[in-house]
């Protein structure tokens, strides 16, 4: 179940690895990332970003979406998004979509 290490950039297409699931926990009344023997409870902003990490969207597209939604400075949002995604990737909670080969 080892995830390959990724370096998050605007070109990355992040997604949760197969062993991790973003779910709403009714008991805790909050979103959690479930992975084997681990649970992470991201804050509301992280959940919103993670819901956009579908392996199809690039980090640049995610940043654009959030900057438009919150009418915020793209560079500031970009730095925060990349830092958060890199932290999750370093902890094994995020991977990058691979191109399908025939």
UniProtKB/Swiss-Prot annotation:
Q: Which GO terms describe its molecular function?
A: quinone binding
Spell out the Pfam families in the cross-references.
PqqD (PF05402)
Q: Pathway it belongs to? A: Cofactor biosynthesis; pyrroloquinoline quinone biosynthesis
Question: What InterPro entries does UniProt report for this protein, alphabetically?
Answer: PQQD, PqqD_bac, PqqD_sf
Q: Does the keyword Mitochondrion apply?
A: no
A GO BP entry: pyrroloquinoline quinone biosynthetic process
What are the UniProt keywords, alphabetically?
PQQ biosynthesis
- Superkingdom of source: Bacteria
Family named by the database record: Belongs to the PqqD family.
Q: How does it assemble?
A: Monomer. Interacts with PqqE.
Return the HAMAP family for the record: PQQ_syn_PqqD
Q: What does this protein do?
A: Functions as a PqqA binding protein and presents PqqA to PqqE, in the pyrroloquinoline quinone (PQQ) biosynthetic pathway.
Protein's name in the database: PqqA binding protein
Q: Which organism is it from?
A: Rhodopseudomonas palustris (strain HaA2)
Protein's gene: pqqD
């Amino acid at each position: 179940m080892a995830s390959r290490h990724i370096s998050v950039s605007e070109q990355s297409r992040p997604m949760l690895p197969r062993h991790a699931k973003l779910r709403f926990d009714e008991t805790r009344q909050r979103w959690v990332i479930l992975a084997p023997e681990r649970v992470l409870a991201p804050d509301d902003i992280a959940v919103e970003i993670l819901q956009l990490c579908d392996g199809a969207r690039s980090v640049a597209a995610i940043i654009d979406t959030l900057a438009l939604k919150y009418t915020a400075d793209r560079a500031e949002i970009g730095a925060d998004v990349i830092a958060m995604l890199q932290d999750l990737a370093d902890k094994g909670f995020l991977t990058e979509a691979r191109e399908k080969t025939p």
